[in-house]
């Protein structure tokens, strides 16, 4: 049973009119028609299987997968460490787990006044209400404590920090940004005020984003160039159609495969990956077709090559590209991982080159026009002309000079914030560092704030850090009012006020002397008066006693007489109808006056008793008066002796108090704005309403976590990666004792992003180096160690030279540093197109040598056969430059390196490889 392209072993290429440059070759078969049917059916089944696989795969993708969401940025890796840090920050402070930061900026024509705050508050409130697109808002300007951090130097702008939904550099973040800007546009206008959103470049920058029509344009141009290369190599239009059909089937199968591998996490580089996959697929299949044509041309009049003989030609381009792109699925940088995703398309193209491409060629039939050799030495033949060693050395020297700018290369992660509008109103780098400290205890007490102050001091000492916003430094700098030196200044003011009140006190003390003398005279007069009164009272008491005795005697006699008359009184009371009885009436007239006398005597006696009691009390009071007057005289004497001492003491204390007040005031002035005044915030100040906003925004809801924002100088580049470890070390040093012992430190923001990018780039650089060494080892196995080393050095030298020229162009001429992902992505694309160009040339030359013993002068050269990969790589790079519109984008930078690198690669191939001896 023949192979999927079993008919190929019976096809013979017959040269027609060998001397004519326009000759064509036709297919003839050495077998009978009956022997032809089974292989033809097999080839049809192969083609049908590919078509069915493409249709089924796309249908399954359509009905089983939801619409893909762009949740992965092109540069920021999402490793476990980053995810854990983001999760801890979001858990402590809900809504702030995103690294998509924006700033609300309210600008006025003049200095903002309190009457402008309602418009600012309305903008903040509107953003907080849009919970679908806004995670959290940190208000600065409305709080007097934090207002200095959110106010521009000229006082015309007020700022608030906004966390958007979605990760930086993703479509979700871009949609959130558009939404919040729309919210601000819907605010009622305020005269003289304008609200806008300022974002760091990393928030909304999607450097690898290509639109669908741009991708289609690049792929279409690549397909046209591939067809032109096929026609220039004297291949038929039918052969070009077979190449395009094979590429279409490969892409139709590769697209669902890539979707399955990547799932819903497409990322901003998905279209970029598909474009690269399409270009590499077209280039791979075109190169395989041209290599197969070269093999047939080299066969000459000998037996036609079998499928086994053609297998290296069909497999070599795809295998070389797949070896370099497939392992990039292990890359951590999303953009470079996207190149690995494009490698999936190359794997499918390799499979198509081994199956459906030979089948379509076989199905072309005997009447189809197939590859024929070119005559003469065309441009592909000239690529293989030997050159001198002097030329190789000269090329090496030029390459070394081109590499020199790499020495001063700067790695950028985002655009320089100083070039962004509104950057002058921000406290520092538009993307701050975030340090979250998680403790097992409540940190909302004076001791914990002292520890937070120590951490803030440590962090601001880290190189590049300008300001640190924390619960202890709410304005980004040491809080002067929350210090012992500031308290000393307030105490000095109080002492100064009290010292001024001592002068009237001394005057009053001096006047007390005369007052005491007057009081002493009055006491003497009182003493004399009391003595006279006491003597008079005693004399009156002597006259009162006989009167009281006589009154009591009269009362007694009256009582005794009443007892005698009681019988008569009782008879009168009990007599019936006394008024009509003469005797009873007469007795009653006698008794009634006497009763009146008895009643009067009783009242007289009672009054006498009261006079006696009052007299007794008066005598008792008057008797104690001399003693009380004596006590008053003694107290006055003590006061008289104390007043001079008090006057002397106050006069002596006044200079000391003034001196202490001056010393405390000078102490406060000397430590003002130094941050070394001894931080202290009392519990009363912690509970004060003026600190409420800081307490709520800088501590977690349970108080066990606090966050610090660090604003640094300069731009976000890979140099900031070192700051992440410095921040952890600095915070750890301040937490060896005190309230933050054994607390957990989490670093996020700019430093964490730079560190994650740096680690991912290092990992991916090592991965690319391993891949390159693997390719070199395989090339050495095919053609010898010298040729293998030449391939590796050639690709590396071409890349470094192109990178150096690009650095000179972008960094030194245009003042734009290369984005951090440009070197690796451009190297991956360059190597994917360049390594097959070099390796396939060596291998194709060996195949030709083994087939004929010598290369046919009229055949397409081995390097010329794989020229489509290099040419289409150049088309891809130039397309990236064009679709970026000539801007300073990452696509332009990648395209520049790729185009220059491929140009240098061709030069290196001409200068080095022909002079390199090979192993036979």
Curated annotation (Swiss-Prot):
Q: What is its main location?
A: membrane
Upon deletion of the gene, what happens?
Disruption causes altered colony morphology. Inactivation increases mouse survival. Mutants are unable to liberate PDIM into the culture medium and are compromised for growth in mouse lungs, but not in the liver or spleen. DIM are found mostly in the cytosol and plasma membrane, and mutants exhibit higher cell wall permeability and are more sensitive to detergent.
Substitution effect: residue 611 to S: Leads to decreased interaction with PpsE, but does not decrease MmpL7 activity in vivo
Function per UniProt: Required for export of phthiocerol dimycocerosate (PDIM) to the cell wall. Essential for normal replication during the active-growth phase of the murine tuberculosis model.
Q: A cellular component term (GO) from this record?
A: plasma membrane
Protein name (database record)? Phthiocerol dimycocerosate exporter MmpL7
Q: What GO molecular function annotations does the UniProt record carry, in alphabetical order?
A: fatty acid transmembrane transporter activity
SUPFAM superfamilies recorded: Multidrug efflux transporter AcrB transmembrane domain (SSF82866)
Query: Known post-translational modifications?
Result: Phosphorylated by PknD in vitro. Phosphorylation could regulate the formation of the cell wall.
Q: Which ranges form a coiled coil?
A: none
Listed under GO biological process in this entry are: cell wall organization; lipid biosynthetic process; lipid transport; xenobiotic transmembrane transport
């Amino acid at each position: 049973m023949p192979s999927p392209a079993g008919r190929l072993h019976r096809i013979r290429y017959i040269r027609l009119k060998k001397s004519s440059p326009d000759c064509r070759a036709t297919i003839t078969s050495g077998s009978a028609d009956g022997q032809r049917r089974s292989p033809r059916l097999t080839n049809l089944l192969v083609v049908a299987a590919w078509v069915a696989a493409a249709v089924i795969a796309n249908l399954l993708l359509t009905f089983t997968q939801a619409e893909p969401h762009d949740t992965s940025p092109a540069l920021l890796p999402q490793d476990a460490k980053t995810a854990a840090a983001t999760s801890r920050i979001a858990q402590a402070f809900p809504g702030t787990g995103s690294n998509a930061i924006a700033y609300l900026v309210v600008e006025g024509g003049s200095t903002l006044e309190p009457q402008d705050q309602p418009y600012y508050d309305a903008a903040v409130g509107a953003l907080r209400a849009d919970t679908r697109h806004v995670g959290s808002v940190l208000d600065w300007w409305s709080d007097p404590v934090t207002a200095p951090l959110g106010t521009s130097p000229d006082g015309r702008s007020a700022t608030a920090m906004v966390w958007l939904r979605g990760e930086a550099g993703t479509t979700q973040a871009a949609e959130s940004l558009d939404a919040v800007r729309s919210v601000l546009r819907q605010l009622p206008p305020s005269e003289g005020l304008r609200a806008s959103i300022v974002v760091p470049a990393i928030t909304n920058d999607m450097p690898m984003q290509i639109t669908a029509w741009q991708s289609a344009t690049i792929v279409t141009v690549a397909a046209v160039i591939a067809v032109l290369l096929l026609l220039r190599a004297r291949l038929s239009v039918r052969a070009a159609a077979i190449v395009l059909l094979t590429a279409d089937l490969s892409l139709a199968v590769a697209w669902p495969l890539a979707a399955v591998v990547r799932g819903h996490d497409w990322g901003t580089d998905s279209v970029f990956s598909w474009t690269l996959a399409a270009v590499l697929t077209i280039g791979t299949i075109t190169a395989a077709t041209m290599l197969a044509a070269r093999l047939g041309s080299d066969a000459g009049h000998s037996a036609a090559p079998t499928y086994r003989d053609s297998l290296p030609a069909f497999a070599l381009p795809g295998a070389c590209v797949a070896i370099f792109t497939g392992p990039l699925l292990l890359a951590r940088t999303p953009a470079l991982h996207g190149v690995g995703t494009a490698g999936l398309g190359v794997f499918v193209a390799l499979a198509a080159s081994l199956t459906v491409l030979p089948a379509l060629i076989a199905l072309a039939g005997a009447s189809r026009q197939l590859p024929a050799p070119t005559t003469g030495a065309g441009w592909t033949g000239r690529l293989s002309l030997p050159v001198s060693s002097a030329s190789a050395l000269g090329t090496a020297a030029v390459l070394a000079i081109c590499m020199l700018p790499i020495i001063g290369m700067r790695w950028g992660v985002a655009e320089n914030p100083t070039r962004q509008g509104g950057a002058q109103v921000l406290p520092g780098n538009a993307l701050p560092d975030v340090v979250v400290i998680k403790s097992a205890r409540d940190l909302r007490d004076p001791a914990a704030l002292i520890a937070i102050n120590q951490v803030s001091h440590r962090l601001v000492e880290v190189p590049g850090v300008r300001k640190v916003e924390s619960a202890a430094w709410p304005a980004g700098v040491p809080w002067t009012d929350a210090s012992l030196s500031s308290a000393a200044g307030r105490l000095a003011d109080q002492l100064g006020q009290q010292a001024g009140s001592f002068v009237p006190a001394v005057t009053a003390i001096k006047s007390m002397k005369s007052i005491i003398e007057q009081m002493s005279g009055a006491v003497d007069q009182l003493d004399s008066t009391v003595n006279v009164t006491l003597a008079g009272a005693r004399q009156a008491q002597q006259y009162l006693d006989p009167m009281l005795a006589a009154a009591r005697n009269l009362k007694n006699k009256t009582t005794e007489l009443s007892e005698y008359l009681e019988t008569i009184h009782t008879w009168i009371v009990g007599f019936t109808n006394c008024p009509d009885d003469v005797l009873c009436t007469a007795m009653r007239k006698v008794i009634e006056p006497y009763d009146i006398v008895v009643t009067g005597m009783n009242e007289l006696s009672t009054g006498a008793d009261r006079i006696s009691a009052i007299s007794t009390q008066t005598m008792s009071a008057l008797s104690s008066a001399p003693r009380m007057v004596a006590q008053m005289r003694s107290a006055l004497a003590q006061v008289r002796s104390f007043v001079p001492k008090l006057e002397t003491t106050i006069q002596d204390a006044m200079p000391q108090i003034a001196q202490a007040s001056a010393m405390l005031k000078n102490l406060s002035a000397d430590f003002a704005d130094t941050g070394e005044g001894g931080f202290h915030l009392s519990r009363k100040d912690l509970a004060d309403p003026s600190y409420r906003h800081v307490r709520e925004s800088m501590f977690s809801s349970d108080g066990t976590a606090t966050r610090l924002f660090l604003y640094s100088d300069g731009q976000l580049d890979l140099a900031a990666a070192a700051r992440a470890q410095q921040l952890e070390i600095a915070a750890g040093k301040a937490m060896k004792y005190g309230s933050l012992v054994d607390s957990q430190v989490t670093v996020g923001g700019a430093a964490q992003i730079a560190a994650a990018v740096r680690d991912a780039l290092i990992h991916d650089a090592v991965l690319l180096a391993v891949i390159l060494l693997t390719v070199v080892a395989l090339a050495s196995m095919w053609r010898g160690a010298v040729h293998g080393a030449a391939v590796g050095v050639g690709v590396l030298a071409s890349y470094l030279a192109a990178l150096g020229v690009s650095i000179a162009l972008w960094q030194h001429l245009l003042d734009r540093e290369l984005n951090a992902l440009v070197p690796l992505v451009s190297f991956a694309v360059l190597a994917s197109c360049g390594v097959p160009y070099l390796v396939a040339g060596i291998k194709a030359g060996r195949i030709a040598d083994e087939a004929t013993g010598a290369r046919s002068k009229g055949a397409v050269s081995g390097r010329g056969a794989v020229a489509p990969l290099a040419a289409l790589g150049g088309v891809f790079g130039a397309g990236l430059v064009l679709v970026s519109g000539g801007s300073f984008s990452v696509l332009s930078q990648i395209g520049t390196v790729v185009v220059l690198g491929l140009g240098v690669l061709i030069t290196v191939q001409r200068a080095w490889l022909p002079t390199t001896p090979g192993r036979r």
